[in-house]
Amino acid sequence: MSTEAANVQTLKEAYRRWHDSKGASVDYWFDSVVAHHISFGSVPRGAAPLKFAAQYNNDVELRGYFDGLLSEWSMEHYAMDEYIAQGDVVVARGSCAWTHKKTGKLCETPKVDYWRFKGGKAIEFYEYFDTAAAAAAAT
């Protein structure tokens, strides 16, 4: 299996578990996908009301993303339907829906994740989603 195919397979399995567990598979991401020194970013860049969606520079800090996400939101679905791989980069495209626990509002959004791998582990990640819809659901 090529490195590109292996990286795609790693992500397919992680996203499958993420969806099936409704977000309870955080440890799998850390054990099987994320490198210790990952650069992890998100379009909101930590702006309220999506403070957890910020820049993280290692796996220890990155726990804050998942803690914030899962304490504030409940996953409805998460589906990555398309993967594009070139060299050490994989782009995953799909959609997800989350309900904000405090407001009860639903956010459905297209989702694009950019990944860069080295030695089978993700060293860079950046996510793109409808931040206006997420902010509206959170307020």
What is the predicted function of each stretch?
Residues M1-S32, T139:
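Short, low-complexity N-terminal intrinsically disordered segments enriched in polar/charged residues
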Residues S2-A5, D67-T139:
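A beta-strand edge to alpha-helix "cap/lid" segment located at domain peripheries
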Residues E4, V8, K22-G23, D59-F66, ...:
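A structural signal for well-ordered alpha-helical scaffolds and beta->alpha junctions
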Residues L11, S25-F30, V34, I38, ...:
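Hydrophobic pocket/interface hotspot
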Residues L11, Y15-W18, V34, F66-L69, ...:
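Hydrophobic alpha-helical core bundles mediating ligand binding, dimerization, or RNAP-core interactions
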Residues Y15, K51, G104:
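Generic anion/oxyanion-binding catalytic loop in active/binding sites
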Residues Y28-G87:
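A solvent-exposed, acidic/Ser-Thr-rich amphipathic alpha-helical stretch
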